[in-house]
Amino acid sequence: MYHELRKRGTRVPHVLIIARSILFNVLFYFTILIYLVVALPTFLMPYWAIVELAKVWARTNLWLLRTICRIDVEFAGLNKIPPGPLTVAAKHQSFWETFALLLVFSRPTYIVKRELMWIPLFGWFMWKGRMVPVDRGARRQALTAMTRRAREELRRGRQIIIFPEGTRRQPGAPPAYKSGIAHLYAETGVPCVPVALNSGLYWGRRSFKRYPGTIRVEILDPIPPGLDKNTFLQRLEHDIETATARLVAAAAPPQAEPQGSG
């Protein structure tokens, strides 16, 4: 399905896509280094200072994507986000949503792999921003520790973003939802906001190419607390997958001109 979608849309010269992508990637990683240096004083400030600086970095990335790669973004359903603490279960197709969703929620934090917290500087800032680490190698203990930390952040009024499939999935790939989100939902007692998107069409998994087009993100109806785990997980998967399939089918990236074409 993913490759079929690549066949649709306005054609853009292959060499132009490659050139834009290389330029963007160079600037993207350069800005990471710049912001890591700029962020050093935030170690002496409250946690929200690094979160706000991360939002500035996210806006910079969106500007670079729009200016260089001709990738725009549209958010729908923002009025559906309830006030106060909640969990956010987002479709994960690309690295894009790991920074872009920072701009959707007022006090966001992410559930992340514990190994990321060990990366020099980058990981330290994740600790400072009070991200919620999870150890994939120790499942039961990991769920307990994750829940404890999640509750701490929810008491601070934060929105906890989790990717329920645990890893990036190519557009059109069969869903693979994990039980961790159901555990978090049952143990925290806060609403869960599903998020659908089509970012993988433009910023592909394990691809350096950035295809022009419009990434669409849709905030879906919140799932209230109180459902049993199985019912919740079935509803979550249905809501996210249905909306994501619609967004993917409605918008495909421009295709590069085949090599050798005139």
Q: How would you describe each model-predicted region?
A:
Residues M1-E74:
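N-terminal membrane-anchoring alpha-helices
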Residues M1-R11, V15-I18, L143-G262:
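Non-catalytic C-terminal accessory region of glycerolipid acyltransferases
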Residues Y35-T60, R66-I68, K80-R139:
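Catalytic core of membrane glycerolipid acyltransferases/transacylases, capturing the structured
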Residues V73-F75, W203-G204:
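Aromatic-capped interface at the extracytoplasmic side
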Residues F75, V132-D135, P225:
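Short acidic-hydrophobic, aromatic-tinged amphipathic segments that line or gate anion-handling sites
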Residues F75, V88, Y110-I111, V217-I219:
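Generic preference for hydrophobic
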Residues G77-I81, R149-E152:
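Short amphipathic alpha-helix with an adjacent loop that forms part of the alpha/beta core around
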